[in-house]
A protein has these predicted regions:
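Conserved C-terminal beta-signal and adjacent last beta-strands/turns
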Residues: 9, 23, 227, 234-238, ...
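Acidic, small-polar-rich N-terminal luminal/periplasmic segments of exported/outer-membrane proteins
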Residues: 24-157, 261, 288, 510
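Periplasmic-side early beta-strands and strand-to-turn transitions of outer-membrane beta-barrels
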Residues: 153, 160-163, 177, 182-281
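Flexible loop and strand-edge segments within Gram-negative outer membrane beta-barrel domains
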Residues: 240-302, 312-336
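Gram-negative outer-membrane beta-barrel transporters
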Residues: 352-353, 422-428, 518-521, 525-530, ...
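Signature of Gram-negative outer-membrane beta-barrel scaffolds
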Residues: 355-467, 478, 489, 576
Length: 708
């Protein structure tokens, strides 16, 4: 196991003065646990909410670590955007990552995952599963990871001053160091915050038995320099009934990255050899400028949550000359996805037991390649091509040359109304959502369509600690824009078929919750069907004159989740399990639905467990947690998964188990200062996560140390 304990001890001594300084200046800080109420999901049971306090008591530096106790979520291998995620087996094509209610469903390239926010900047993370109710927002077919960023008011709670400074630092024995600072304050009705965090990670070592293409123990090109900051200014007025917040967040990854970030590098005979993977310096950036307003007691409107945002995803590569997906651009290459959106969410009380939720959502996305390259389109003639075939190729080239390409765009608009009524131990929910989309592909073609999506739910509380729930929700998701990196046109025109509709999910779910303060249990069973499943053209390597995005079949998924916890005194014990079985039924002649991880993955039944004890004096918690994934067989494609020779593959993902031990010490006896230690993957297990393909694995044994 790669655990340099002597370096850890040295770092502890080095930071001792920093602890004392923090204790002196922030002795009265008391951060409350953030309680999230009503995430606009109606009667849907929600699980696994990570609060600011829980985050501060962990060594997590990414969402994979922060959410590892949620069995329904699986993260792939690698670092940064090398990782894919699945939620109930469904991939990033239909799972959103929302930060301060800003989100985009466009991707840079199908060989890399979506950008996930730095947890150092957030105060709470929740998980929405399955198709959402009417108020869940645009495209809520398969759930979301929802994060809210921290602000000055959160950090000022409990202080006897109107300003403060927070410092944090961390060290990972498996080649990583992190540090950051936050400055925050309040003057009159105004408050502000600036927070900066850096996590500098070198190539990490995988588990015992792993060897890379050069015979070494490290995973090639897994190093990343992650830098993020958050700036916020807010004002509260009207006796606290009104609040306006303007924020800007930027999160950036820098490093030497491969063409296909989900893969590392294989030997010379491999399809992912060093020549095809062509590592180059790259920067991937996500920024969000957000203006938010919260108002209470506005006459008929009891509460209003509104925001407007500009979300940008940028990719910069120092040289893409060996990257065919990027058009083989020599020298610097820039790609950008810009999303502008607004949300207005109203709550009105019709009667003492009836709450009415209603609102509108708007989102416009635009992809901006560095240049359009359709003038360089070329179809290579086969070695024994006939004159007629060559003539056809030249004609197809002329078709592509004739197009005047423009930035592809998509606009989604939605409106909803939802009523929640309480009567005699029952909470009844009913809603209706209207969604409309308009897509313009880079050839100028436009397609639009609308859909109505009802939702129903009931919660029954027969006794004080029990409740049972059922929901039946419909949600739709518009066609995704084609990969931003490939909109240049050098490999042909990507259009959209006439009559293309939004795919539509129907999710039926039953569940229960029990919580008496000591023992708690919850569970759910779901069945989901998605009609008119969407797919972009999947053959991204060949030069074809014109290809189209289409509706191409349907998807079915079913599964269950169970969880239980026991708390008494300082003892906390938890256990959870999740199982899902997504299957894709492709009705298109060209079989466009794919087993690529952007669509989903058949993950094995996943178990999580943890046991911890917190002592009163000293205020110290020590614990263990485990994540165990059973073997998974079969493809998500109902017809089976074929290799490059057209033969059916026997898809098997091996099971694995990973154990961690952790500790949290509060030297001042409260949340003012946290000193965290964890030993992740104690037994140095070498394994491949189920949401990933081929060669990217996760870190082996790792000692992590952090304070905040």
């Amino acid at each position: 196991m790669n655990a340099p304990f002597f370096r850890l001890s040295l770092l502890s001594l080095t930071l001792a003065a920093g602890f004392a300084h923090a204790a002196e200046n922030n002795a009265n800080v008391a951060l409350d646990t953030v309680t999230v109420k009503g995430d606009r999901q109606g009667s849907k049971i929600r699980t696994n909410i990570v609060t600011l306090q829980q985050k501060d008591e962990s060594t997590a530096t990414d969402m994979r670590e922060l959410l590892k106790e949620e069995p329904s979520i699986d993260f792939g291998g690698g670092n940064g955007t090398s990782q894919f995620l699945t939620l109930r087996g469904m991939g990033q094509n239909s799972v959103d990552i929302k930060v301060d209610n800003a989100y985009s469903d466009s991707q840079i390239l199908y060989h890399q995952g979506r950008f996930i926010v730095d947890p150092a900047l957030v105060k709470v993370v929740s998980v929405q599963k399955g198709a959402g109710s009417a108020s869940a927002g645009i495209g809520a077919t398969n759930g979301a990871i929802i994060a809210k960023t921290v602000d000055a008011q959160d950090l000022l709670k409990g202080l006897d001053k109107n300003w403060g400074v927070r410092l944090n630092s961390g060290f990972a024995g498996n080649n990583g160091v992190s540090y950051g600072a936050s400055v925050f304050g309040k003057e009159g009705n105004f408050d502000g915050l600036f927070s900066y965090n850096r996590n500098d990670e070198k190539d990490y070592e995988a588990g015992k038995g792993f060897r890379n293409v050069n015979g070494g123990k490290t995973v090639p090109y897994s190093a990343l320099d992650k830098r993020s900051y958050l700036a916020k200014i807010g004002t509260t007025f009207g006796d606290g009934d009104h609040r306006i917040v303007l924020s800007h967040m930027k999160d950036q990854h820098r490093g030497i990255r491969t063409v296909r970030e989900e893969f590392a590098v294989g030997d010379t005979k491999s399809r992912i050899n060093i020549t095809r993977q062509a590592p180059a310096y790259r920067e991937t950036t996500q920024s969000n400028t957000n203006l938010a307003y919260t108002g209470k007691d506005l006459g008929f409107v009891e509460k209003l949550d509104a925001n407007a945002y500009v979300l940008e995803k940028k990719r910069y590569s120092a040289d893409d000359k060996d990257n065919g997906y990027a058009g083989n651009v020599k020298g610097p290459n820039h790609t950008r996805i810009t999303t502008r959106g607004m949300n207005f969410n109203f709550d009105s009380r019709l009667a003492e037991q009836t709450l009415l939720k209603y609102g509108i959502n708007y989102r416009h996305q635009e992809i901006k390649p560095q240049a359009f390259l359709n003038s360089e389109f070329e179809i290579k003639d086969k070695e024994k091509a006939t004159n007629e075939e060559k003539k056809k190729n030249r004609a197809n080239e002329k078709i592509v040359y004739a197009y005047k390409l423009s930035n592809p765009t998509k606009t989604d608009t939605g409106a909803y109304i939802e009523a929640i009524h309480e009567i005699d131990g029952f909470t009844l929910t009913g809603g209706l959502r209207y969604d409309h989309f308009k897509v313009k592909t880079h050839d100028g073609k436009t397609v639009s369509s609308s859909s109505l999506n009802p939702s129903f739910g009931v919660i029954w509380q027969p006794r004080e600690h029990w409740n049972f729930s059922a929901s039946h929700n419909y949600a739709s998701r518009s066609p995704r824009l084609y990969d931003a990196l490939q909109t240049h046109g050098k490999r042909g025109i990507i259009s959209i078929a006439d009559g293309t509709k939004a795919e539509r999910a129907r999710n039926t779910e039953i569940g229960f919750n029990y919580n008496d303060g000591t023992f708690a249990a919850n569970g759910s069973y779901f069945r989901q069907t998605i009609k008119d499943a969407l797919a972009n053209p999947q053959n991204r390597h060949d030069s074809v004159a014109v290809r189209e995005a289409v509706n191409t079949g349907y998807i079915k998924n079913h599964g269950y989740e169970l969880g239980a916890s026991y708390r008494t005194g300082g003892l906390t014990a938890k256990v959870g399990v999740s199982r899902s079985k997504p299957r894709f039924y492709d009705t298109h002649p060209k079989k466009l639905l794919s087993a690529n991880p952007e669509f989903g993955a058949q993950t094995g039944r996943t178990w999580t467990a943890s046991l911890a004890y917190r002592f009163k004096n000293p205020n110290l918690e020590i614990g263990w947690r485990g994540r165990y994934v059973q073997k998974a067989t079969g493809s998500i494609l109902a017809a089976g998964q074929k290799d490059r020779d057209g033969k059916l593959e026997n898809v098997v993902r091996q099971g694995f188990g990973v154990n961690d031990v952790f500790a949290n010490w509060k030297p001042l006896g409260k949340d003012t200062l946290n000193v965290n230690l964890s030993v992740n993957n104690v037994f140095d297990k070498f394994y491949y996560p189920h949401s990933q393909r081929w060669t990217n694995t996760l870190p082996g044994g790792d000692v992590m140390y952090a304070w905040a």
